[in-house]
Each structure stands twice: as C-alpha cells, then as structure tokens.
Amino acid sequence: HMGYTSRNRVEMVRGGRKFFSRLLQLIEEANHSVHLQFYIFIDDDTGNTVIRSLQAAAARGVAVFLHLDAYASRELSQKSVDELRESGVQVKWFEPLFKSRHFYFGRRLHHKAVVVDGFRCMVGGINICDRYNDLPGDPAWLDMAVYCEGEAAYIVYHICRQMWPEKIRQPALAWKEIDDACSSIPQTDWKEVRVRQNDW
C-alpha cells in the first residue's frame, strides 16, 4: 500500500444530485484525460446523461477511458457500448473467471472512481444508474464520495491507467504538471490522504 500524501484538497460529496452534478462538471472541465471505473453502469436516464457527457469530451479531443465490471454492468446495452466506441471512448470490460447470466465466479471490479487530468478525482460507493440519483419522487440511496485534488488523485490516475493494455494510447501526464497544480493548493487546505486499492 502507498503511504500518505499531503498536498490534497478534500471534500465529501453526498450521493444523488450533488454527486452527479460534480461528476458531469468534472467530465465537462477535462482537458487531457478522463478515466472512469464503475461496478454498475446502466443506460437509463442517469447513465445516458453521463454517456452524452463522455461523448462530448471525446469529441473535443479528451482521451476517455471507461472500465466496467462485465457482470454487474451487463444491463448496459450493446447499442450504447457501440455508440461510445464510435464517438472515440475506450470501453473495457473487467471479466470474471466464469460467468453466466445469473452466476459468476472470480474477481469483481468494485471500483467507483473518476479521475480527470491526473489531478482531480472522486471515489466512493455510488454507481451510474437511476437508483443512485435523485429523481422526482425517488430520492437516491444515501451514499457518499470523496472528491480530491492533488497528489492522491495522481496515484488513483496511475491505478486506472495501469489497468489498460500498453497498446491503448494514453496521454502522458508528467509529474511536473501535477506538481505545479499541487502548488496551487493553499497549504491551509492541505489534507493527508492515503490511497488503498481493493478490487475484490
């Protein structure tokens, strides 16, 4: 496990509307890359809104990577996957050792994370579908995410990056760029953050 990093700005984000507003804002403000890893991603109203945002990012030249659990996201339609790929979004499935429609055996991708430009990230327990969003007459399940800018986000970025094969071209983010960005965080805002990875 990695040690603690200190140059981080941290904020708790409540699930539902606040989470999805922040998620869309992050994608819309991306300049270089967007990495998303999610356990459940369904192309309902919420999922389709995120899909459109990812497609718009890819259209303006941002490198977009979507990594999903093959079993938990099996309701995502092939049509949506094809449209994402056609728009330039890289889509990858995390496959178990054995699966059928009602059973799986093996490791799962339980990550729920987004990283933008190697400097901003949001990690939590919120999946991409309507039941995690605040819809009219149907409030979201109570869940939280941590939003982070700084060194810890760069570690999460590398975790996401390393899960893609080398043949997939990814923009290289030099540490100096992140170091310069971290320097913009006032020291009074610094929080110590330790990144721990568990994909079971």
Residue spans for each PLM region:
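Charged, low-complexity intrinsically disordered terminal segments
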Residues: 1-200
